Amino acid sequence: MQLSWQVDQTDIAHVKAFVASQEGNLFVRARVARNLAQTKPTVDRSEFWKQMVGMRMTSVQRSGPESAVAAFLRKNPFPLSYDQIAGVIDGSERVALIAATLRSHGGIRFPDKIADDLARNFDKLEDNHEWATALAELNNLVVPVNAGQERQVARYFQQLLHGFGPKQSRNLLQSLGLTRYEIPIDSRITKWLNEFGFPAKLNATALADAGYYEFVLDGFQALCAASEVFPCVLDAAIFASFDGDGWTEENTIY
């Protein structure tokens, strides 16, 4: 069965006006500059690991400009760098180090669960040369590709990484500046779409199901295509509309 998304001129005008209202926001400008660049820096283990740590932390907790998560990700040097974690040989000690680091920062929910997921992901990447495959998948996206190719990479990381469902896998790719079409759909996006008049009432909890998630994302992408707006830009505009001018050049990290 095929579903045809119908987008009318009123919908298009609404999207264009909304994006225009946020285009001066520094968060939106940073998203445009990074994610719509024609060529992007190659992703290495260190950068991927840092963003994976950060995006795992954003699950089920606040991640706005003044949040504990954002403050943690702005730390320099990064407290849980790849080299630091790789230097711990014992798996249980690795879990303990991650959990203790998160606790000492303060304000991070579920430190033990996050630590366990990250340690398991480290092991998976180190075993069976999975790093080579993971980095190859990522670096296929350093030049513009189509929406289908982005989705295949998102599905790969969704299956590979512990603690990364449909939203977090796309959050990871977007945080690396690699995606234009595949976006992390959260309660902000569903609230905006429901108010916009999305044809089905959306439930943020149901987005944990990959099929439902991709159904909603298909509709979001169809709306963007008709409006000639990249999904990552509309996503940034929605995000900015909730946070106002809280994001600055110094604290923009996503």
Listing of model-derived features with the role each one plays in the protein:
Residues L207-Y254:
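A basic, often C-terminal nucleic-acid-binding module that engages the phosphate backbone, implemented
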Residues M1-I108:
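Structure-specific DNA junction-binding interface
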Residues A70, D112-A119, A154, P166-Q174, ...:
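Short, well-structured alpha-helical segments
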Residues M57, A147-K201, I238:
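Catalytic DNA-binding helix-loop module of base-excision-repair DNA glycosylases/AP lyases
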Residues S59-V69, L125-T133, T179, F198-P199, ...:
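Short helix-capping/linker segments at secondary-structure and domain boundaries
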Residues P65-D83, W131-V143, D186-W192, N203-D209, ...:
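Short alpha-helical "patches" and their helix-cap loops
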Residues K50-S63, D117-K124, Q174-S175, V233-G244:
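Short, hydrophobic/amphipathic alpha-helical patches that form generic packing surfaces
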Residues P79-L160:
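Alpha-helical ds-nucleic-acid-binding substructure associated with the helix-hairpin-helix region
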